[in-house]
Amino acid sequence: MQKLGLSGLRGLEGFRSLAGSTSTAAKAPNPKPSSDIGGSTYGSFANLKITAEKLVKEQASVKTDLEMTHTKLRRATEQINLLEAKLQQAVNENAKLKVKQTEDSKLWQGLDSKVSSTKTLCNQLTETLQQLASQTERAEEDKKFFEEILGKNSKAFEEFNCLLHDSSIKLECAEQMIISGKQEMLRIKQEKEEMDQSYKEQLYASDTTIREKNSLIKQLEDSIEQNKARLLYVDSRLECMEQELKLKEDVCICLKENLASTESEKNDLKLRNEGYTLEVQKLSKDNKELNELLSGFTVKVTELDKEHTSISSHVTQLISSFERYDGKVHEEKMLMIKSAKDKFEHLQNQYVNLISENNALQTEIEELKSRIIELQKTQEIVMVQHVEECQVAEDKIRRLESEAEISASNISQLEKVASDLEGRVQKLLEDSRSAENHKQELLQKILKLESDNQELLGRVQSVLNEKSNDTESLQGEIAKRDQQVETLENQVNQLCSIIDEKEQLHTCAVEREKNLEEQKLQVQASLAATESQLTEAKKQYDIMLEGKKIELSKHLKELSLKNDQAINEIRRKYELEKVEIINIEKEKAEKLIKEMENKCNEKISENRQDSERYLMCLKEEHGSMVARIQQDNEHKESTLRAYHKEELQRIQSQAENELRERLSSLRKDHEIQMKSLTKKHEENCQKLQDELELQKSKEEKQRALLQLQWKVMGETQQVDQEVNSKKEYSVSSIKRRDPYIRKEHQLQLVSPETKRKDVNLSGIIQSPITNMLRKVEKGTQDIPKHRKVTHHEYEVETANGRITKRRKTKSTVMFGEPNTQKSLHDTADKDPTKMKKVVAGSHPHPANIGELFSEGSLNPYAEDPYAFG
């Protein structure tokens, strides 16, 4: 419609110029007489011919200008729409990224709270395990006490044997006194029976204690079975995690397939762009053909001029020819308009298809992003110690935002150059490359997440291996305890046999037996108290575990509900914004179409009225104009032809120069932009490489530090002292030495290969059993060794040293052996290979891993606060 309006205006302006020339010619005086009518008609016909040629040329130029302007306007509108869509997409993506950042921050806060709660639980568990260990130590001390009492009884039996020997000698000397002592023997028999009953009661009490200990052993076995059940549960959980990982791998494969489909669609778009360029070339060829047609029409007009030499006979033919010419011009215009409309509709359909394809691609990209978010959420539950990687991801998101801002600035610059086709095609190619780069980055992130999952699986498997080793060690300890119980039973049987043999000499031991009974009652009371404490501790532990499990399940449910609500709200908002934007654009388009239609109709009506007026004027003034045009026609033909040729050559040269200048300027601008973009991309790549190198160096440093720490821990040697005889040590020294703790200590001396394997898991997962064993080791190292002293002197350990004191008692006293620790230090220091690894100023035997890590350069918390959870 705009083409029709502009071409009509140009045609009307040409008719007005003709009318003005005719009117001026009519007003001018006629110098020739009326007798020379033939010459004047010939000149007027030549003038008409010139004006007709001018009109044809002007119409052709107007058509070309209109077509160029229309194509430029269409391209400009399309580019503006595309740029607006890109800006909206960038704004939406920025909003989504901000929402994601807020959600990630909330999730990290929740995870920190969970980690703190789990740490408190671990501390409580370690405390309870320490209490249980102390109680077991007390029970073992009670066992040793009973063994001491049995030794005293054996000594008493030996004394009784001596007395029996003496009494037998006396009986041989005093056979005469047998008759008088029969009554006394009867009394002795009664006392023996009483003693038998008392000893039977003692045996029954010892049996009850053994049964109680058996029950304790059974309880320990039940706890081991519970641990096995927990291990089975952990195995099932691991299988579930493996299934989830397989599902995630399938999702990654689907994502790769979607990426391949998007690349194929990009190739299709490139092919379509090439088709559009071919169509533009075809349009240029059509324009050339139209120009040739116009030249043919000019030839036909010249032929008509030759044929119409006489005015009187051929004026009607001229009028009819003009009318035919106008009809043909109108028909050509209508055909051009129809073809342009068809092409415009075809282009609109293609544009709609492209928009739909872009929307489909956007939906697919959003689905991919949502899947990636779900994968990140599932892995964030397991990945608590990967905070640095998340920080790097946030930095990358910020860089992407900065790149989006830079792209927005580039878009504002590109809007100025949106009038040319070449710039637009190159920008589309750059956008496609950037999209491919983004997809490659997403693929790299997915690969990183998969590698992290594999690392976590390896860590969990190592933890399971450690737990299985712990269970095996506990089973070995239980078997050893069973052996100890059997040895005790054998000793009891031996004592019973000794008691049966020496029933006659138990009259003197009644007082001692009473003391023993009192001690047994005290021991039984202490055992009952310990059992009650154990049951209470177990109940408290079970209650704590159940409460924590309920709290964790509630917290997880709340988090899932919040995430679902936030996702639904974002989707609703996005859909509402889409609908609003579509409605607004539709309303704008309808308004523009209506306005254009109204304007075109108004212009058409005005043009029709003007054309009718001018036709009337032309018919009235035609008779007067013909004579004057024929007179001036012959003189002006030669001059006009020369003038037109020069103008055409000049215009062509100017147009070619302008096109060359524009093309050169556009190429230069394009090259400058490409260079700037390549420089920016290279700088970004270098920054990313530098950051990766820094991270790698940090990780290598941490690994080296951990290896040094574990090597230092492995080099602490432990001296095992062998027991040669019971005479070298007193009963109090046996109390202090704990074989059970020594065995636990030996079980923890693991090979260096297992230590290397456990390096990665030392700070991640610390089981309560390992903490308990380490604390027991610490206790055994702190206990000083003793030796037997039979003198009346004894020493007291103070802060400043030892002080010797004298007392008149004859009890055995223990001296600590200060040289044992020194010997340990000396043996550790003599090794030259170990001297290099120990840091100057540090203790050679650190009591705990925390003390080791708090030393100078071996502290990993100085650079990485999240290295050990």
Swiss-Prot record:
Cite the residue spans of the region called Disordered: 841-869
Stretches of the chain forming a coiled coil according to its record: 64-298, 330-614, 641-713
Tissue specificity here reads:
Highly expressed in panicles.
Predominant place of localization: nucleus
Phenotype when inactivated? Decreased pollen fertility due to abnormal synaptic behaviors and increased crossover formation during prophase I.
UniProt keyword list: Chromosome, Coiled coil, Meiosis, Nucleus
Q: Name one GO cellular component term.
A: transverse filament
Which GO biological-process labels does this protein carry? Answer: homologous chromosome pairing at meiosis; reciprocal meiotic recombination
- Where can this protein be found? Nucleus; Chromosome
Q: Which positions, given as ranges, span the membrane?
A: none
Biological role: Required for chromosome synapsis and regulates crossover frequency during meiosis. Acts as a transverse filament protein and constitutes the central element of the synaptonemal complex.
Q: How does it assemble?
A: Interacts with CRC1.
Please give the name of this protein: Synaptonemal complex protein ZEP1
Q: Which organism is it from?
A: Oryza sativa subsp. japonica (Rice)
Q: What is the lineage of its organism?
A: Eukaryota, Viridiplantae, Streptophyta, Embryophyta, Tracheophyta
